[in-house]
Amino acid sequence: ADLDELRDFFAFIREADILPQFILYAPEDVIRFNQLVRDGVIPGEKLPVLYVLGRYTTGQVSDPKDLLPYLDASPFVSEWMLCAFGAHENACALTAAGLGGHARIGFENNHLLVDRSGAVDNAALIVQAREGAYLMGRTVATGDQARKIMQPQW
C-alpha cells in the first residue's frame, strides 16, 4: 500500500468529519493498526475499532475467549466493539459488554439464537443480546450514543 496515499485519505476523512471504521480481524491487525497510528499515517490519539471474531476460522466459528488477545493491545483505542461469527455470537457480545466494550449483532454473521434455533429476523438476535446486557447492568446504545462511541479523538 502507498502510505502517502493512505495518509492523504485519512487526512481527507478527518477534515470531512467522516467517521472511519477500523475493522481488525486478528491480533496481528492490531499491531499493524498501532504502527500506522504511531507513524502518523492514521491521525488521531484515540480511535474506535471493531474487532471481528471467527471470520477466518474453520467454519467461521467464534468463541468468547477469542477476544482476549485484543484487549489492551492498543494504546490508541478509545472505544471498541466486536462482532462475532457463528452460534456463539451472543456469548461473544455479552463477553464484550462485561469487559466494557460494545457489540454489533446481525444476520451477516449469524442466524442462530442461543438455543440453536433459527432466528426469524435480525431483531430476535438483538433482543436476546439486549436482555443479557440488561442482566449485566448495561444498556443498548441509542443512535446518538452509537455515533458518539464511533467518534474518533483526532
What spans do the regions from the language model cover?
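Catalytic alpha/beta core domains of metabolic enzymes, predominantly
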Residues: A1-E108
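Flexible, glycine/charged-enriched surface loops at secondary-structure junctions
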Residues: I23, M136-Q145
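Short secondary-structure transition/capping segments
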Residues: N34-L36, D115-A119, Q153-W154
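Gly/Pro-rich active-site loop or hairpin
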Residues: Q60, E108-N110, R116-V120
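C-terminal helical cap(s) of enzyme catalytic domains, especially alpha/beta-barrels
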Residues: V114-V140
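Short, basic/aromatic-enriched C-terminal tail that caps enzymatic domains
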Residues: G143-W154
